[in-house]
Amino acid sequence: MFGGLSFRWYAEATDAEPENPALFCGWQRTFGTGCQTRTAKMSEKRGWHTLCSKERNRIPKHNRPDEPDRSLSKAPKKGQGLSRDGKRNEKKSDKMKNGKIGVTTENIFPVIKKFLYSDHEIFLRELISNAVDATQKLKTLSSIGEVKGELGDVSVRVAVDPAKKTLTVTDRGIGMTAEEVDKYINQIAFSGAEEFMAKYQNQAIIGHFGLGFYSSFMVADKVEIYTQSYKEGAKAVHWSCTGTPEFEMEELDERRDRGTTIVLHLSEDAQEYAEQSKIDDLLKKYCRFLPVPIVSGKVKEWKDGKYVDTDKDNVINNIEPLWTRKPTEITEEQYKEFYRELYPMSDDPLFYIHLNIDYPFHLTGILYFPKIRNNFEIQKNKIQLYSNQVFVTDQVEGIVPEYLTLLHGVIDSPDIPLNVSRSYLQSDSNVKKISSYITRKVADRLQELFTTMRADYEAKWDDLKIFIQYGILTDEKFAEKATDFMLWKNVDGKYFTPKEYAEMVKEQQTDKNKTLVLLYVDDPVEKHTFLEAAKAKGYDVLEMNGQLDNHYINW
């Protein structure tokens, strides 16, 4: 890539003599103690050829690109063999017994209450997700003619009653019959969403595990369900349970409005969930982009020295977030407005990347390169992961390559595997594919900006380089691409790719071993005397004062 040249770095102060005194004639006298050497070799295969020991030791041996896995497969033990597909077979003992593990139902609710979810507040996300599922199912059935008439208001409503210590979630979805309550509520881990998806494919249904409803027992001593199916002739059903395997269920003679109402009688240690402000905060955290309107109380206005309720519903969410739309329909200003919606106190981003892929996995989203005003503002965990517009987590290290956790934005994918609580990522081949896809999209976007908008790219380089340098140091695939759009800046404020710079200085700064010698300073003002001495000899000097520049010099 660089004509076989390797780079040798020289700082302005050192204890070592340069290898080629002829090239640096007079340099030692001018610079006091001479020049320190630091090497960073380049090769055709990839940008930075060797890791410094500090960086190298942070990478497991089996992941190092230049060190193949030398582990040997263990030989089969006695009693083992290999099947035709190469897999090891265990020889079964005549005393082996097959059976089923017994589960004591009396013990399952304490487990659910304490350990099912990492955060108890997630119960609200689960209940709202179920309500949205029911509404989306109703819309699907209506679109194919299985539901007659107008659907009316399909908002999901959340209400608190501090006096009664209750929290109520109501939807106007498909509702349930007594048989369906028995099937989907009385049998833990049987998900109605799974069955519905099998029948009506290609519909955005959130639920997967059938345990979401039972998360309500983490905060409630008693839970009641009132439900009315959309089906003609179906009776309303009332169901209640106090957190034991015993429940009560009855059909009601009086028909109710279509849909389901869930009433949580909050336990003494969960009274905070009867506060409107607490619920609003949780809804904004988990449900701000759900595809069905979520109503929580009334819009407030300032009147007579205090806030009072108006008659207008307080809709928490944006049902059509920007990432669900086609990029061709979105303006630059709309991308910036969405960024401000996500991060109200931040400066406008440098640029964005719109993700949209349907095969071999489903993934949409928008990633932003934030403008970092100073070195103390670098923060991770600013990318939000959603599944069908339901917030899951902002801990995305398993999906997004480590260096891209510095970015901001949103990723939405129903194909990212989650455990039963949806709070932690599971190992899966799709995750690796998604990570590779995101890396490629980021590299392609940077290359596009560099090629088509070079001047603008250079103007933003001081803000961009922290992301690109971190990527080169931590991601080999990204490093292979990044050398084409990575820049070096000299003390005159001019920018060059490594290849461009090597071509410019090779005549003046190549030693007898055909090694290209690069000079740098970390503070041009403080090292002004040294700079003038270097320039007097016809040398060009780079400015290396970024947070990660030392890592490059040590490579």
Task: State where each predicted segment sits.
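Serine residues within intrinsically disordered or low-complexity segments
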Residues: 6, 43, 53, 68-73, ...
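Intrinsic-disorder-associated, low-complexity terminal segments enriched in Asp/Asn/His/Tyr and depleted
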Residues: 15, 20, 49, 57, ...
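GHKL (Bergerat-fold) ATPase N-terminal catalytic module, capturing the glycine-rich phosphate-binding loop
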Residues: 76-81, 86-273, 281
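GHKL/Bergerat-fold ATPase module in large chromosome/replication-associated machines
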Residues: 205, 223-246, 267-271, 277-555
